[in-house]
Every structure is written in structure tokens, then in C-alpha cells.
Regions:
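Glycan-association/targeting regions that enable binding to alpha-glucans and other polysaccharides
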Residues: 1-108, 116
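Glycine/serine-rich loop-strand microenvironments at binding/catalytic pocket rims
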Residues: 45, 55, 59-61, 298-312
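Short, charged/polar micro-motifs that form catalytic or ligand-binding hotspots
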Residues: 46-51, 96, 151, 158, ...
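Substrate-binding/active-site clefts of carbohydrate-active enzymes
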Residues: 110-174, 181-307
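Residue-level recognition of beta-strand->loop/alpha-helix junctions
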Residues: 177-180, 315
Length: 315
């Protein structure tokens, strides 16, 4: 059910809801019905959401007494080609979240920029640039070919987070949600290179276990970022850049990881990738081998829960 309430006195003659599911071929238009409520004109209508779990984007289109039209989205009143739609999430209401979720304060940490527990660490890979000046401006401008490598690191690590546990508890934090900590070759680490190991700049797997154990003493749970819809191209699974030897999915048609990805010449880079970013090849999420790797006994989720994680936020 949607309701649009124009400013009092606005010369609106018609109001429509425009909605578009992520898997829909075109926009759906719903004309909203005007009504007087407390001396104010409001427009109401019903939009039937898709049956499947997906995202739906929507905004409003207004017709004016002078014959013109405008759109209204989260960026306000604007032209059609400038509107920023709102997002509606269609979810499965039988899906259950952990009982503890939502019952306390969750604090999000971007590990590289939070706290450096071990100062002046050597870079574990030669293509990483260390920012010794913690007040320096991050690299944000594109390189000579228009790309962003996200290769500058400020050195935040797991020991730094552990050092701040008393401070976080004092603030009333109950859960720490960490942006990705797995080995990856960018400072944001959403391009996973190795799901089973902490990025060496952040520390070791043992450091993570210690962090979780110490956090529990303060009544704090550690929630990890589970980035399972895609990997990095620079990973031990895809290995386009060759950092991990001569094999793996991109280089070897017989690789056990090959079926995880969708290789096809119709894609710009020869494989399906997240929003067309060549460094983020998408995985076939229902591939049995991949599902077993992520969710099976001894797999990714099982491994990190055993190491002490309280749960996962799924990307």
C-alpha cells in the first residue's frame, strides 16, 4: 500500500507509482487514487509485489495543472532522467534470523581504517602501498586508464580491534560487524582471494580466534561479512592475474573451480561479473561444488564459526 501526500496547495492533477523489479523487463505503472483526508489531498494505491525474492525500485510521477510532469524520488522532485528511486526488498517471510540479532547495538568496522595494533607492518604483497601518515588522504582519483585499484593501506588490523574492546564495550556495543577480513587484494576486501584465511595484513587466523575469545569476555559477538555472490578475479579460485600459479578457473578449463563461474563470449570480459566489474567475477551460487564449499561441513561458514564468529552478514 502506497500513499503520496503533496504539499498543501500543490497543483498536482495526477499521481502514479512506477515500480521495477530487478528481473522485470519494464516498469509497472499504478495510478494512485486521490482522496480528501483532513482537508488535504492524498493519493493512495496498491502495488502487488513479485512472488519471488528480489529488489524492487520505485518512484512517483506527478502531472501538473500546467500540463507538465515531474518525478519524485529519494532525491526529491526532479526530471525523469535524474530521479533516484527508493528500494523495496521482497523477502521470504519464512526465513528466520538468529534470535540475538537486533537485540543489541551493532557497531560496523572497516578493518583497514579502524586501528593499527601492530605499527609499521611490512606489506605482505609488493603491489600494496602503505600509508604511514594516518591523516593522509586516501587514494581516490582514477589511475591512467580510469580504474581504481584500492591499493593504499592504512594498516588497521585485528590486534587494533582487540585493543579497542574496552572502549567499544563502554560505548554499549554488543556486536561488531566487520567488513571483509579474508585475504583479498584491495583495501575494501570485497574481492575475496582466499575464503579460509585472514588477510595477512590484518593478522592471522589465530589472531581472529583470540579476538573472538577476548570479545566474548566483554559480552561482544563478532559478525563477519560473507561475500559469497562473487570472488575476486585475483584469487586462488579464479586467478586471472596469475598470482596463484598457472591453474584455476580462468586459466584452466579443467579446474575444479571452473564450474563455479559462467564463461561466455557474450560477456564483455568473457565471463559474468558483478555489475560488469571485471575484477569481481560472479559465481553460480547454486553450483553443488560451490554450495558444499561455502556451507558444507568443514566449509567456509563452518570454519569461521568454529574459530569464534557469532554469525555472518550476507553480501
Amino acid at each position: 500500500s502506497f500513499c503520496f501526500r503533496p504539499e498543501r496547495g500543490a497543483a498536482v492533477t495526477r499521481c502514479e507509482l512506477l515500480a521495477h523489479g530487478e528481473f522485470a523487463a519494464q516498469w509497472t505503472t499504478v495510478e494512485l487514487t486521490p482522496a480528501q483526508e483532513d482537508g488535504h489531498v492524498v493519493y493512495r494505491g496498491i502495488f502487488t509485489a513479485p512472488d519471488d525474492v528480489e529488489l524492487v525500485w520505485y518512484h512517483f510521477r506527478l502531472s501538473w495543472a500546467d500540463g507538465g510532469t515531474s518525478c519524485y524520488g529519494k532525491n526529491g522532485l526532479c526530471a525523469w532522467d535524474a530521479v533516484e528511486p527508493w528500494q523495496l526488498t521482497v523477502y521470504d517471510d519464512t526465513h528466520k534470523t538468529p534470535a540475538w540479532f537486533g537485540r543489541g547495538v551493532t557497531y560496523q568496522i572497516f578493518p583497514d581504517r579502524f586501528c593499527e595494533g601492530v605499527e609499521n607492518k611490512p606489506m605482505p604483497f609488493p603491489d600494496r602501498l602503505y600509508q604511514a601518515d594516518k591523516h593522509a588522504e586516501p587514494f581516490w582519483q582514477p589511475n591512467e586508464v580510469g580504474g581504481h585499484l584500492n591499493e593504499d593501506y592504512f594498516g588497521g588490523d585485528l590486534k587494533g580491534i582487540q585493543m579497542k574492546l574496552p572502549y567499544l564495550r563502554e560505548m554499549g556495543v554488543d556486536y561488531l560487524y566487520l567488513n571483509p577480513i579474508f585475504e583479498a587484494h584491495s583495501n575494501h576486501r570485497y574481492n575475496t582471494a582466499d575464503y579460509l584465511n585472514v588477510d595477512p595484513l590484518l593478522g592471522t587466523n589465530e589472531d581472529f580466534e583470540t579476538l573472538c575469545a577476548e570479545a566474548r569476555k566483554y559480552g561482544i559477538g563478532i559478525v563477519l561479512d560473507g561475500v559469497f555472490s562473487h570472488t575476486g578475479s585475483d584469487s586462488r579460485y579464479f586467478n586471472r592475474e596469475g598470482r596463484y600459479g598457472e591453474g584455476d578457473a580462468y586459466r584452466d578449463p579443467n579446474s575444479p573451480y571452473r564450474s563455479w563461474y559462467d564463461f561466455d563470449s557474450r560477456y564483455k570480459d568473457g565471463y559474468r561479473s558483478w555489475w560488469g566489474f571485471e575484477t569481481l567475477p560472479e559465481v553460480n551460487e547454486e553450483n553443488p561444488s560451490y554450495v558444499e564449499f561455502i556451507t558444507g561441513e568443514g566449509g567456509v561458514i563452518d570454519t569461521w564459526l568454529r574459530r569464534g564468529a557469532a554469525g555472518f552478514r550476507l553480501d
